[in-house]
Amino acid sequence: MSHSFIVVMGVSGCGKTTVASELANRLENGVYLEGDSFHPPENKAKMGAGIPLDDSDRWSWFDTLIAEAKTKLAEGQTPVLACSALKQAHRDYLFNGFPAYRLIHLDGSFDLIKARMDARDHEYMTSDLLRSQFAALEVPAPDDNLLTLSIAKTPDELVETAREWLESKS
C-alpha cells in the first residue's frame, strides 16, 4: 500500500482513538497519531473548563498535526491520525499539500455517542461538549477519498472494513 495521510474523524466519543490506533497496527508501516495529545495546554484548559474550541484555537493545532504527519511520511511510515476534523475547512486545511490522503468518518447518533461518553473517563472532553461538536459537524460530502462507517458495528468490523477499503485504494 502506498503511503497516504489517513485521518479518522468524527465527534468526540465516536471511536476515533480505538479505530485509528488499531488500524495503524494492521497497516504495514502504520503509525498512530492521537490528535488530542497534540493540543496545546491552553486548548486543553479551555475544553476542561467546558468551553468549546473555536477555529482560532484550532489552526496552530492543525499546523502541529500536519508537521507530525509530514515527518512520519518522510520516515516511510503511514500516519493514521485520530482527529475530530469537524468542518470541511478543517479537512481542507489538514490535507492541503498532501498528494495522497484518505478520510474515514465514524458516524453515529447523538444518543449512542453520549451514552458511550458517559461511560468513560477522558482528560478534558465531557459529554456536555458533545452537543457543540454535533452542531459544528459538517458531514463530509461523498468523495473517492472518503469512507463513512456506522459506529453501530464492532470496533474490529470498523477497522477491518477500513483496512480493506484502504487496500482497494492503493
Where are these regions (language model features)?
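P-loop (Walker A) phosphate-binding loop of NTP-binding proteins
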Residues: 11
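Conserved substrate/cofactor phosphate-moiety recognition/catalytic segment
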Residues: 21-64
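Walker A (P-loop) ATP-phosphate-binding motif of ABC ATPase nucleotide-binding domains
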Residues: 5
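Conserved lysine of the Walker
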Residues: 16
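Glycine-rich phosphate-binding loop used to anchor ATP phosphates in small-molecule kinases
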Residues: 57-98, 102, 106
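Conserved beta-strand scaffold positions in the cores of enzyme catalytic domains, especially
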Residues: 32, 103-105, 146-148
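Hydrophobic anchor at the beta1->P-loop junction of P-loop NTPases
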Residues: 8
